[in-house]
Design a protein with these regions (language model features):
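N-proximal helix/coil linker or "cap" segments that precede and/or mark the start of modular domains
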Residues: 20-50
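A short beta-strand-turn-helix
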Residues: 49-70
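Short, internal strand/loop/helix patches
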Residues: 105, 116-154, 162
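Bacterial Sec-dependent N-terminal signal peptides
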Residues: 1-24
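Structural microenvironment flanking redox-active thiols in thiol-disulfide oxidoreductases
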Residues: 83-122, 133-138
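Short pre-active-site segment immediately N-terminal to redox-active cysteine/selenocysteine motifs
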Residues: 68-70, 75-78, 111, 144
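Thiol-/selenol-based redox modules, centered on thioredoxin-like
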Residues: 150-191
Length: 191
């Protein structure tokens, strides 16, 4: 047992000595963005979890959306990047809302009364459901906010986009048009 501890300790000391430059050790740097990209890749191709929520008085479940491409957005009011993308999301909704094979929904942990005020304030046109914070995280794969997910017709995650650093409306719009629009279009065109 003592030899194992001595061996592990010597490996640790050697590794530490070799990792130093000019006497200063530098810890490995992993950005949050790269962690989100890893999580995004892990989620793509997996079934989206079951849910049962009320949107505008209508109960919607994952199973009730089968056969449609679904865009799901997760947000909350105190999130500047979430607010920055709302105008672009309204445009996205307008672009695809007439397609009977497409559904646009969003989840927030804001109260139903607050949702009514926010929909008016930001002219939100798409469906918004109030769920618990825990449910938001469960459904958005434990990502931050905003998170947008595109599901294919079978309820499989086709694409996942995590935000957080875009607070400018134009940047948010450019991102949504360049990435999200293409993803939705690709999922719709895929048979």
């Amino acid at each position: 047992m003592g030899k194992k501890i001595l061996f592990i300790l010597s490996v640790f000391i050697s590794a530490n000595a070799f990792s130093q430059v000019n006497g200063e050790a530098e810890p490995p740097h992993i950005s949050m963005d790269s962690l989100f990209k890893i999580k995004e890749k892990e989620s793509i191709g997996k079934l989206f979890p079951q849910f049962n929520s009320t949107f505008n008085g209508r109960i919607i479940t994952k199973d009730s959306l089968r056969g449609k491409v679904v865009f799901i957005n997760f947000w909350f009011a105190a999130c500047p990047p979430c607010i920055a993308e709302m105008s672009a999301l309204n445009e996205l909704y307008k672009k695809f809302s007439s397609n009977k094979n497409f559904e646009f929904i969003s989840f927030t942990y804001e109260s139903p009364a607050r949702i009514i005020l926010l929909k008016k304030k930001y002219s939100i046109k798409y469906k918004v459901a109030s769920v618990t914070r825990q449910e938001c995280y469960r459904l958005n794969q434990n990502n931050g906010f905003p998170t947008s997910i595109v599901l294919d017709r079978e309820g499989v995650i086709h694409d996942l986009f995590t935000g957080g650093d875009i607070e400018d409306k134009k940047e948010a719009k450019d991102f949504i048009i360049s990435m999200v629009y293409k993803s939705i279009n690709g999922a719709i065109m895929k048979q």
